[in-house]
Curated annotation (Swiss-Prot):
Listed Polar residues bias regions: 200-211
GO cellular component terms given for this protein: cytosol; elongator holoenzyme complex; microtubule; nucleus; spindle
Gene: Elp5
Record's keyword terms, sorted: Cytoplasm, Cytoskeleton, Microtubule, Nucleus, tRNA processing
Deletion phenotype: RNAi-mediated knockdown is pupal lethal.
Free-text function comment from the UniProt entry: Component of the elongator complex, which is required for multiple tRNA modifications, including mcm5U (5-methoxycarbonylmethyl uridine), mcm5s2U (5-methoxycarbonylmethyl-2-thiouridine), and ncm5U (5-carbamoylmethyl uridine). The elongator complex catalyzes the formation of carboxymethyluridine in the wobble base at position 34 in tRNAs. Binding by the elongator complex stabilizes microtubules and promotes their growth.
Family to which the UniProt record says this protein belongs: Belongs to the ELP5 family.
One Gene Ontology term from the biological process aspect of the record: establishment of mitotic spindle asymmetry
The name this protein goes by in its record: Elongator complex protein 5
Length: 262
């Protein structure tokens, strides 16, 4: 399911919608959270409309979460809240890009916020610097989901250790779930890998392998019959030195010192 890939430990999630479906954004994100067991009491949304013009609306959101977290000891609140922000197009109608970036950064640093979701449709961004604003949101996001078409999406995930993964998936929407399958031939999201059978583990190297690791019968016999110089034999024997004279050796049987007067 798509929720297995989106609802993770990554805190700031940016959804880039190439299909212009902003109207389903809150319902779509809420369904992903519910699939992962996130209760309604952990999902909070920022008011939309003219109220976004007032900075107090944003401040009240952060203060509310802080007060709820300190005044309650339930398990749902102790893990933090899931914040669903208005679409980026709505935010830009009332606030500057600098304010939006600062607010996103505050939510990212807040201990009372578990995840932040922001939906952006590039075609709906009327700002002349829309490309730079969207790039700034991607920089702040730890997970970027791009809906490229009805059957294709991509996912960029940044991990705390600095690693980045970029994968593409084919998607299939049914009445009950949003199923995705990696385009590189991997298993669908949420599927457990199949355990290999013992017979498959015992298979030998294919004949087309360029590196031969097995010996045939004749090679095994030749290897066993070979005795290396440093090998120890099972039968004890005395040490003998055998010298075979060469043809150039000149031995004189007479004593060369016989003629000396000593």
């Amino acid at each position: 399911m798509l929720s297995n890939l989106v609802v993770t430990k990554q805190k700031v999630v940016l959804v880039i919608d190439e299909l212009n479906r902003e109207r389903i954004a809150p319902k779509f994100i809420g369904s992903l959270l519910h699939e992962q067991g996130q209760g309604a009491d952990t999902i909070k949304a920022l008011p939309t409309g003219v109220s976004l013009k007032h900075v107090a609306t944003f401040e009240a959101l952060i203060d509310k979460y802080a007060n709820n977290n300190t005044g309650s000891t339930t398990d749902s609140n102790s893990t933090g809240f899931n914040v669903i922000l208005p679409t980026l197009a709505d935010l830009l109608c009332y606030q500057t890009p600098a304010f939006i970036f600062g607010f996103l950064n505050r939510l990212r640093r807040s201990d009372n916020v578990r995840r932040v979701f922001l939906w952006a449709s590039p075609q709906h961004l009327q700002d002349p610097h829309a490309d730079y604003i969207l790039a700034g949101c991607e920089y702040l996001a730890e997970l970027v989901l791009r809906l490229e078409s009805d059957k294709l999406l991509s996912l960029i995930s940044r991990k705390p250790g600095g690693g980045v993964s970029n994968r593409r998936y084919s998607c299939e929407v049914s009445k009950t779930q949003f199923k995705v399958t990696p385009l590189d031939g991997g298993l669908p999201a949420g599927a457990s890998p199949k355990q290999p059978s013992p017979e498959a583990e015992q298979t030998t190297e294919p004949a087309s392998s360029t590196f031969k690791i097995e010996l045939d019968e004749d090679e095994v016999l030749a290897r066993n019959a070979l005795t290396l110089p440093y090998e120890r034999t099972s039968e004890p024997s005395e040490g003998n030195i055998i010298y075979t004279p060469d043809a150039d050796d000149d031995f004189d049987e007479e004593d060369p010192d016989e003629d000396l007067c000593i």
